[in-house]
């Protein structure tokens, strides 16, 4: 039985050696995987740095573009304000024209009879003026001695009447 102990020690040593070899194999495999992961991370780090540079450049461009757009919007606001002012002025002008038109229409409708009388009296005045001119012209001509007031009446056959329609 004395021999069992050394054999058990040898078996334990062999088992320990196999265990160590297994651990070494596993550690070598883990080292290869870690080396591969390290290389992948180095590649990812380079890509992240490139993406970071591109992102920074894009942010700078976006900031410049935003500033440019803000400047243009501010200038455009003054144009829009000017157009709004013109629109307000045109609207005020339209309101004034409407008020004046309504006032004129109202005054015409109130003074319709007076306007009709003025037109009739102006027609009478024009007839009298024409007769006066005809008489004055005849007096100045050589045939004045042959004409009489009766002839003046014969020459007044011209009709100077004017009809005024009341469409107000």
Curated annotation (Swiss-Prot):
Keywords: Cell membrane, Membrane, Transmembrane, Transmembrane helix. It comes from the Bacteria. One of its GO terms (cellular component) is plasma membrane. The keyword Membrane applies. It is found in: Cell membrane. Residues 144-168 are annotated as: Disordered. Its main location: membrane. The chain crosses the membrane at residues 7-27. It is a single-pass membrane protein. Belongs to the UPF0478 family. PANTHER family: UPF0478 PROTEIN YTXG. This is UPF0478 protein SH1183. It comes from Staphylococcus haemolyticus (strain JCSC1435). The lineage of its organism: Bacteria, Bacillati, Bacillota, Bacilli, Bacillales.
């Amino acid at each position: 039985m004395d021999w069992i102990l050394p054999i058990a020690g040898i078996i334990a040593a062999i088992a320990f050696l196999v265990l160590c070899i297994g651990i070494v194999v596993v550690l070598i495999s883990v080292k290869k995987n870690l080396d591969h992961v390290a290389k992948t991370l180095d590649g990812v780090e380079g890509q992240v740095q490139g993406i970071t540079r591109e992102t920074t450049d894009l942010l700078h461009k976006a900031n410049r573009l935003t500033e440019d757009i803000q400047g243009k919007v501010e200038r455009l606001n003054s144009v829009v304000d000017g157009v709004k002012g013109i629109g307000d002025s045109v609207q005020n002008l339209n309101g004034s024209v409407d008020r004046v038109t309504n006032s004129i229409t109202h005054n015409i409708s109130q003074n319709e009879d007076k306007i009709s009388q003025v037109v009739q009296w102006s027609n009478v005045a024009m007839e009298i003026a024409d007769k006066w001119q005809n008489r004055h012209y005849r007096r100045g001509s050589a045939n004045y001695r042959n004409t009489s007031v009766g002839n003046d009446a014969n020459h007044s056959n011209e009709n100077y009447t004017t009809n005024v329609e009341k469409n107000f």
